[in-house]
């Protein structure tokens, strides 16, 4: 039984899908005007692990994540580079997908773009205007938050508790300071014709329409970073309530932010860490291990200390797996697919509890300890070795961490034999030579 913390209810709830055995999940994607930073990478990993968990528990998953390829920042960059918005957007979409691949994430099944959904966005806004939930003002269109009594249910703030200017745009055209733009009149950059004149859509409408268009009127899980809870997800939910009279998602799941050396990552501090640079520097496995080492609802700190701690932890896990594989191969023992089901089940139970990765890591360490104890026996029970090793590999697979299996052919077996014989003969020069060759092959 999978249980998730629902931001909307402030409770950890049993997951009950709309369609039995299937999960529909939408995660807000990037506005593509720059490269992905490590803060963008966290939800990539968090929701990839969640998807893998559902699949491990027997669910099928439809995973949708959008690209916002229309935005003032994209238009500004296109003007600065004397090119089109489409060129800018495609550059950063390609870069974003590259990071997803480098992180070994399972790519979303559907990646809709705003520009490909424009007709339906305009139709959606027009219906909101005609039903009295939105109004036109000098070519702009605003959503009336007072028209939806449930406004504030995602961020748990009532209108009278909100502070004007807190991540919202204020102007004299609005009937209420918290009314938000559905359509923006413009004569600059890319624009589309609409019943209200030329313009482009507001950010908050795009995701609702893409969810309705690609999945349906209600989805199982809507995910994203905690910074999207208000106003973005709040405004999405309000539009859905106004249009269809129902909740947009049954479970709202948000990951916490990423800090750098204990400080918030920001341009002003100059401490932005680009995701591609991090992965190329640390490697896929270490990056994923570090990100998942902290519960997704707690802030994650990137520092030399946390990186080194994660490196040591991961080495303690992967090294015994490699040793087990090599020793079995040298003993001509072929490991099957069977695994320690009790340990693997305990691991999944931890993740089923609101993706409690720290507790899941404890199960990994416990199983690795059993593996090490078995490997130290005078007469190694390779059947038991295989059970523990395969269980840990399955656990790591759910976390998106790849376990390499070294090639152990006759050449490698002969090299091990020469190394062992040289040590037995106390021929240390030869032993060092053979050992170095084994190290170069990644076998030691």
Where in the sequence are the language-model features?
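Alpha-helical recognition segments enriched in aromatics with Gly/Pro capping
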Residues: 1-33, 48, 119-325
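N-terminal, positively charged nucleic-acid-binding surface of large information/translation enzymes
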Residues: 9-14, 18-106
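Short catalytic-loop micro-motif centered on adjacent basic/acidic residues
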Residues: 63-64, 108-112, 222-224, 382
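Short, glycine/charge-rich beta-strand/loop segments that flank catalytic centers
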Residues: 67-71, 92-96, 106-121, 139-148
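Structural preference for alpha-helix termini/caps and helix-kink/transition segments
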Residues: 264, 273-444
